[in-house]
């Protein structure tokens, strides 16, 4: 076995031993954004998701790669069920939700049991004017998805957090979309933009239905981009999600892989750090 395989095996054993206890005692549920392991799922989709389940994740958020199940969502649902994984959500583009494709897209995700469809990024999110226009499109989609038992959401990068708190593009989107729509805060990008992710959960209660736990650093600071080895107040953030976020899913996401670590190894390390935080908090 190579070094990365050995590291995964060690982390899987440690995390797996505690996974049932953590899953039973914690809320929100814990998932992983599959973009974090995009190279590994291209090489072995089923094997990688099986390993994700063994680490103790309760769900996966899709980002457009469905391996051999691209045209067979029912079989993918069976595979997820077999591995006790839920669909925590999916990142989809506006083009996939255009009128001509809406029914096919929503039917695919409903088969997976996926209720949360999130726009991962849009160039209009870089400005107040663009975000105002985009909010109208998000609001229209919210109305179309609600009868299907689904929600639309939007995911931030640093561009949506530019400007003064209260007048950022993120604030504009929050104020101009229905309360049922998801403000999927990416904690890493919020931090990287110099804003407080905890404050934003409290600012828009009930809107953080899912959120990305990603370790990044505020301007002028550095560190290791792994949950628990960084500077983020993960306990305070989790407390806010439980108190006011109406949060269903904490979704671990990795886009940086330090010290030559593999993608799945890094995800496992962040999950280990997250579970260490949760273990010190009151169960809920």
Model region roles, listed by residue range:
Residues 3-4, 24-55, 113, 165-182, ...:
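Histidine-acidic metal/acid-base catalytic patches
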Residues 8-17:
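Bacterial N-terminal signal peptides
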Residues 19-23:
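Sec/Tat signal peptide C-region and signal peptidase I cleavage site
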Residues 36-38, 64-66, 93-96, 123-125, ...:
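Active-site-proximal loop/turn and secondary-structure-junction residues that shape catalytic pockets
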Residues 40-42, 68, 142:
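Extracytoplasmic low-complexity repetitive segments enriched in small/polar residues
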Residues 50, 58-59, 79, 86, ...:
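Active-site acidic/histidine proton-transfer and metal-coordination neighborhood
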Residues 61, 89-91, 118, 153, ...:
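Conserved beta-strand positions in the central sheet of alpha/beta enzyme cores
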Residues 61-78:
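Glycine-rich, proline-tolerant flexible connector loops at the mouths of alpha/beta enzymes
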């Amino acid at each position: 076995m190579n070094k990365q395989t050995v590291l995964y095996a060690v982390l899987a054993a440690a995390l797996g031993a505690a996974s049932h206890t953590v899953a039973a005692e914690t809320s929100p549920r814990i998932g992983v954004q599959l973009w974090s392991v995009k190279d590994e799922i291209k090489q072995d989709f089923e094997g990688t998701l099986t390993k994700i389940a063994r680490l103790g994740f309760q769900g996966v958020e899709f980002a457009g790669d469905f391996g051999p199940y691209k045209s067979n969502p029912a079989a993918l649902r069976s595979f997820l069920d077999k591995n006790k994984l839920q669909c925590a959500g999916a990142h989809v583009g506006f083009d996939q939700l255009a009128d001509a494709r809406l029914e096919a897209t929503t039917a695919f995700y409903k088969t997976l049991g996926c209720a949360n469809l999130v726009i991962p990024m849009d160039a209009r999110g870089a400005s107040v004017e663009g975000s105002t226009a985009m909010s109208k499109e998000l609001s229209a989609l919210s109305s179309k998805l609600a009868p299907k038992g689904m929600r639309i959401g939007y995911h931030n990068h640093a561009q949506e957090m530019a400007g003064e708190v209260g007048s950022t593009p993120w604030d504009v989107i929050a104020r101009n979309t229905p309360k049922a729509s998801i403000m999927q805060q990416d904690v890493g990008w919020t931090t990287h933009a110099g804003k407080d992710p905890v404050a934003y959960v409290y600012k828009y209660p009930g809107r953080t239905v899912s959120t990305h736990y990603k370790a990044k650093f505020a301007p002028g600071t550095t560190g290791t981009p792994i949950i628990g080895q960084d500077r983020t107040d993960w306990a305070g953030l989790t407390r806010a999600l439980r108190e006011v976020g109406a949060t269903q899913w904490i979704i671990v996401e990795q886009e940086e892989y330090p010290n030559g670590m593999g993608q799945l190894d890094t995800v496992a390390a962040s999950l280990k750090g997250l579970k260490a935080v949760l273990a010190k908090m009151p169960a809920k």
